[in-house]
């Protein structure tokens, strides 16, 4: 099929482990969808564009809402840059800035 891979930035891996287990399971489900079908075929309610090259995975759980910000890098790879529990309606600017800094560090 699509042959996409989802990788996780080392700092985002620690953030992912810190969110509740049900949200981690949802993250894995969305990552599997992205790998199987590619980012062009997966949309709302699973993923949504943020700005520039950034997209977000949307995870819901018993304890609230979490997001994983990712970008396409080198070929058919998606790199998860930042994972956080969302507390406001809008994605915090600081979360976007963190993801952009991490994206620059891997280029």
Regions found by a protein language model. Name each.
Residues 1-65, 74-78, 85-107:
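Basic, Lys/Arg-enriched alpha-helical interface segments
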């Amino acid at each position: 099929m699509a042959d996409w891979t989802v990788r996780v930035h080392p700092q985002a891996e620690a953030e992912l482990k810190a969110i509740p287990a049900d949200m981690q399971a949802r993250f894995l489900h969305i990552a599997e969808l992205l790998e199987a079908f590619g980012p062009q075929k997966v949309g709302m309610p699973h993923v949504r564009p943020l700005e520039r090259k950034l997209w977000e995975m949307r995870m819901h759980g018993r304890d609230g809402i979490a997001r994983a910000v990712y970008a396409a890098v080198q070929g058919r790879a998606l790199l998860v840059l930042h994972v956080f529990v969302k507390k406001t309606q809008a994605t915090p600017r600081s979360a976007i800035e963190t993801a952009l800094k991490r994206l620059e560090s891997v280029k």
